[in-house]
Amino acid sequence: DSMQVYRGMDIGTAKPTECERNRVSHHLFDLVNPDETYSVGRFVRESEEVIKKLKLRKKIPILVGGTGMYLRSLLFGLSQIPEVSSNIKLQVKKWQKEEGTPACWQKLKEVDPEGAEKLHPNDTSRIMRALEVVISSGQPISSFQHNDNSNAQRYPFYGMICDRPRQELYDRINQKTLEMMDQGWIDEVRKLLARYPENLKPFQSIGYREIIQFLRGELESSDLVPLIQQRTRQYAKRQLTWFRKENHLVWSHPDKKEQILKECMVC
């Protein structure tokens, strides 16, 4: 998961509990501080190291998460996206500074509607990256990502998507948000802000961004939880749209444990 690598961001990223970690070994958690950079390239390299070690111990690695690009890059290799000149990067940075991230998202929507649909209008770094690529190459970033998906699969793999009815999924999201609030999510954010500036990229993720707005007095307490729930549901919808285009994945309701286990054994 792209957010669970950050130390101190525990409740809001739904990291495994200490009890769960004691029952089975977990990897690639708490690798960097929120003010450090973590990339898909680093994820692939570190995942490959973990997989090698587990194979030597005759263990089968299980990957869990919802960051589609991370999974695709591990299975099929990193996207061969062309280099972007410093001039174009400066131009996009100027747009973002002068017009704001939502305006940049609108620009992206005009030239790469598919790519824009996958991103939240406030996801500054990914929006800027997508704009840089389309301006530099004349092609949307999604075209490079789709092309790379035709590469040979690098590992034998059985992939499953939890296929819940939409209302059941949304109900679980709403309940999970309430549980995370009860666990002290707001206090977690307060502690993070005591150590780090609020404009860091990880703090733009869903929930953290809204809690920061609440702590700044820009969001009423009565609006906080419903807004996080809404944006999480929207993100889940975008995730499902992404994964529907991944032909190597099987869709199954997680309650069908025997069927899932049987299919895994066949693979």
Task: Please provide the spans of the model-predicted regions.
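Phosphate/pyrophosphate-binding catalytic cores of soluble transferases and nucleic-acid-acting enzymes
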Residues: 2-267
